[in-house]
């Protein structure tokens, strides 16, 4: 299995590029009226699972370095995410032209990422989520080095337990109403994050796991079955299962297999790999720009047809993300001596 995991590591940025484009498609406010594209768009929240899986995978590599420094780890993650985040939410705040006390309070909640944890609904929830995951990963890594897979079992089990508690609380106490804001979006990604870390361990530490024909068949069958379940969930039970968190379960099985298949694909088609790698390198900028540009665009512009709206918002997002990426890479990385990477 080690060769395919090395391929996964090699094409990690390209897979992130695929994930961010999928997420951008998911967030489009206007349907395309093409059934297969609209279904692919409707399940685009799986792009987040890909990001989280690859984050766990990559963090294991980072912390396994001989010269690892915890202070530098937190500093690099801080400067990679928060300054750009603050710039974007600052522009969004000014563009909305609302300077009330409530608006300032919401801005502070966003900027500190704390609003997410007290039930504030916000499009930038993923920043709070990933900052939290980055913060706790060194604790997991230390426990994993001491206790091995037992630590992984407890952390993954904690994620499933939070999902189950949330689901039961929603169903039994709140008539399946979303009472916790977007908090479930993090709970639902805890298992796949630590599964990603296990894959990182297998790749980095050279675990001798043979990728036999039987293992391939089991993995593909499990992923295909999960995809069918996802289709059923999405077609017949979308709102009921989305609220109580159960709609996120299929991606825990689908994501690792999908990432491995994408790695094989990008390894074969080099030109496509280079294109998607560019999007992957700008994945943070694309995420930050598109969520606010989509919102502002559709709040203020309603005279374009749906196709023009979709194309224009994505093009503006690409342009804004590229500018933000260049500024961060040229200015911030030079001043902080931190190499900007996904």
Regions found by a protein language model. Give the residues of each.
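Membrane-proximal cytoplasmic C-terminal regulatory module of class A 7TM GPCRs
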Residues: 330-342
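Aromatic-anchored segments of alpha-helical transmembrane domains
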Residues: 21-29, 111-115, 156-171, 222-236, ...
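Membrane-interface helix caps and helix-loop-helix hairpins in membrane proteins
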Residues: 33-39, 116-124, 171-183, 236-244, ...
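Solvent-exposed interhelical
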Residues: 134-161, 200-222, 302
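N-terminal membrane topogenic signal
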Residues: 1-18, 148-151, 215-218
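Transmembrane alpha-helical segments and their boundary/interface "anchor" motifs
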Residues: 16, 42-52, 61-118, 133, ...
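Alpha-helical transmembrane segments of multi-pass integral membrane proteins
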Residues: 94, 122, 193, 221-333
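Specific transmembrane alpha-helix
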Residues: 47-62, 125-142, 164-209, 247-268, ...
